Amino acid sequence: MSKTQLADYIKVYEGTLSSEQCDALIARFEASPAHQELKHAEGSYRFVQLSVTKHWLDVEAQIGHILSVYFHKYHEALGIGRFWPPNPLSEEVRLKRYLPNGSDGFTPHVDVMDHTTASRFITAILYLNTCSGGETFFPDLNVSIAPAPGRLVVFPPLWTFPHAGLPPRDRAKYIVHTYLWYPPAAGSRERGP
């Protein structure tokens, strides 16, 4: 493998879910307002999130299986298998909706900021639909990934990969979002985020 550049650690995979599967997840999200929660920090982010609950375990299993296939492809493509932790754990799967209201989006940030999030080593964003705007943008690397049904982006969550969720302009953007994290050390009581 030739010398790897930072942008090479941002991988995009197409067709991880069919358009029909994506539409079904969006419909189920919209049919579950009791499980939705507005997440908002002035000047930083705003979106509606649905954290997977016992009513969504089938979705968590489906997404978990799909992601495990692509996480394997990720570390194989980069030749980092020997550095990949055995038996990584997955943070809860979240479905998110960003409205085209001029407020929803996520300013540049990283996904590891403190002891609680320090177990994260991979970010996964699975887009469920197409919209104008709504790109995941890596400003330091000038890399932009547009939303499309079944498109998956995988990258490290660290300070070398600040990224933004740009606001959608014409319709809501829906994503599935999760992280892989290191398993706790043997004998540790910590479970992670």
Question: Across the structure, where does each feature detected by a protein language model lie?
Answer:
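Fe(II)/2-oxoglutarate oxygenase catalytic core
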Residues: 1-152, 160-193
